[in-house]
């Protein structure tokens, strides 16, 4: 047996360079690069290894650990999980910053490799700088917090443990049914310790991502279920995109006259104009998809996790005879809603079902319902695009909240722009293959409903964890994945203030991204939620503290986000009219550096709900009659929902 004497960190870098994936016969490097923020917990260990010989790994410099890990996740998501980035941080707060990103990746089933520095395995220096001491267990460090949010977690306390740890790490990272964040904790002393590693540990490894076939029994059950149903509806989840099964889903829909709604993760697998594409479904869905779903007698979930937003807290499907058929590579997700399970690759399952159902000459009983539903939504969409603020007689989409004081926002923001009109114009002016990235606030709802995807895989929404601050970093990750396309971060002022550090990284890397910042001076989405459930406006508007009341009910804060971003070297624009927006979008396309368009929009001018309900924890007892009424409404809605 040949051996190579290397440090743990050097061996790790060499191993990562030898990992490949194969999918449908195509082979490629699995780990494109590594994001780094160096500190004493990783710079002289893993940092030294990367400086000495990074191999083909591209080394990026992050600005915030959560930001760079979000970018890594976005890269893998845009690459359909076929290629990933790693991330390394120092010990303590540096590693803690990546915990949110680990949770985001795991919730979305997106592979990301996290390599946080850790405290000394020998404990000789305890307590080291940035170490937490737990008196009941000295083996615990900050990095144990990753256990709850990682799909695989390990700590390398001896150099030779690296081998089994990394073999297991690759198993999870390349397993479409169980992928997510993989965390390998690297004690800072062990990173620099040497060991004689066997050469076979560094051999080229090709991880084949197999397309799992459905069993004959589950397939037969599925065919029997479908053929006795008259009004089925499909839900196109993220699994359709990751399995690259869009053409098969289109063929299935067209052959059997079955419409489909889209989840946030599944949107843009198929262009929005497809005659069977009803658009977004669920809480943030539109009138077309939700109307059809309410009457459906069969719901065929394809690659979806059936979150509360997709099912409207399990209240959307109201047909008494409704049943569920779940096609998913993950048995865990396929097992939801008492569904008939087909545990298989989406593409393979659809192909076999097409063959079987064609033999039976199956066709749904829909006549004009699909076309009528789509036409009704197109009419509504046109109305949303053309909403203009008209002054005192104006009724916003989310009415009954700020109706009396919208003029205060007009004065503070210097704008009369409505959010729906802005989105409509952006959708019209962007290139067909431009990628939009979003995550949190009111924008995901508006975009799932309103955005017309004209090319496949151009809608990138992180809504499994809806992580505020993902947007700008996510845009960088998407740009690294598809450098030839324009990428736009669709972000509210709340999310932007939480995290936009990787905007600087985009400048450093000369990877142009475009930030479309919707400023309504508040956490508008949550303000809608609280006021829609009987509360007043409390802690969600961006107002100064009132020195008389001692509450945050003073004047509206005015922030010049364009001026702030310009200080980084970003090309910026200030927009308060549709004419200015058009000019800015056209000019931004000509730029070679990252851009930011600071768009001032009025609150309450986003879309509202369509035939859906969302279960939230409303107070059962309150002095407020409005809160009591909201609670009674919740009880009534729960009676119409499934219990699990």
Swiss-Prot record:
Region (Thiamine pyrophosphate binding): 442-522
Residues given in the record as thiamine diphosphate binding sites: 65
Pfam families with a match to the protein in the record: TPP_enzyme_C, TPP_enzyme_M, TPP_enzyme_N
Key words, A-Z: Hydrolase, Magnesium, Metal-binding, NAD, Thiamine pyrophosphate
GO cellular component: acetolactate synthase complex
Similarity field: Belongs to the TPP enzyme family.
Listed pathway(s): Polyol metabolism; myo-inositol degradation into acetyl-CoA; acetyl-CoA from myo-inositol: step 3/7
MF GO annotations: 3D-(3,5/4)-trihydroxycyclohexane-1,2-dione hydrolase activity; acetolactate synthase activity; flavin adenine dinucleotide binding; magnesium ion binding; thiamine pyrophosphate binding
Function description: Involved in the cleavage of the C1-C2 bond of 3D-(3,5/4)-trihydroxycyclohexane-1,2-dione (THcHDO) to yield 5-deoxy-glucuronate (5DG).
Cofactor descriptive note: Binds 1 Mg(2+) ion per subunit.
One record GO biological process: isoleucine biosynthetic process
Designated name of the protein: 3D-(3,5/4)-trihydroxycyclohexane-1,2-dione hydrolase
Cross-referenced CDD domains: TPP_IolD, TPP_PYR_POX_like
Cofactor: Mg(2+); thiamine diphosphate
EC number: 3.7.1.22
The organism of origin for this protein: Bacillus thuringiensis (strain Al Hakam)
Catalytic reaction(s) noted: 3D-3,5/4-trihydroxycyclohexane-1,2-dione + H2O = 5-deoxy-D-glucuronate + H(+)
Residues annotated to bind Mg(2+): 493, 520
